[in-house]
């Protein structure tokens, strides 16, 4: 992201987004920096993911929350 103080606004602090295996991302979903999405997870369309997503879950909303656990 970036600093809030005027002298820090030009600096950014990038972090990777890590996607597990077999992840589905819906259209217009926003995933913030530093988030890890676990294996077999689904991110609903339009969701804003601000925290890590556990494996085998469906998340959605603003901010994204667990909507369902996927059972095999």
Q: Which role does the model predict for each range below?
A:
Residues 18, 24, 36, 42-44, ...:
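Glycine-/alanine-rich, low-charge beta-solenoid repeats
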Residues 1-35, 70:
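Flexible, glycine/small-residue-enriched loop-and-beta-strand segment within the central core
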Residues 55-72:
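Conserved beta-strand-loop-alpha-helix hinge in the C-terminal portion
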Residues 27-42, 47-51:
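Beta-rich strand-turn-strand
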């Amino acid at each position: 992201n970036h600093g809030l103080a005027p002298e820090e606004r030009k600096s950014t602090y990038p972090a990777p987004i890590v996607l597990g295996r077999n992840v589905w991302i819906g259209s217009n979903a926003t995933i913030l920096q530093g988030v890890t999405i676990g294996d077999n997870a689904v991110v609903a369309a339009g969701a804003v993911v601000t925290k890590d997503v556990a494996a085998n879950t469906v998340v959605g909303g603003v901010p994204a929350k667990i909507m369902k656990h996927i059972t095999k």
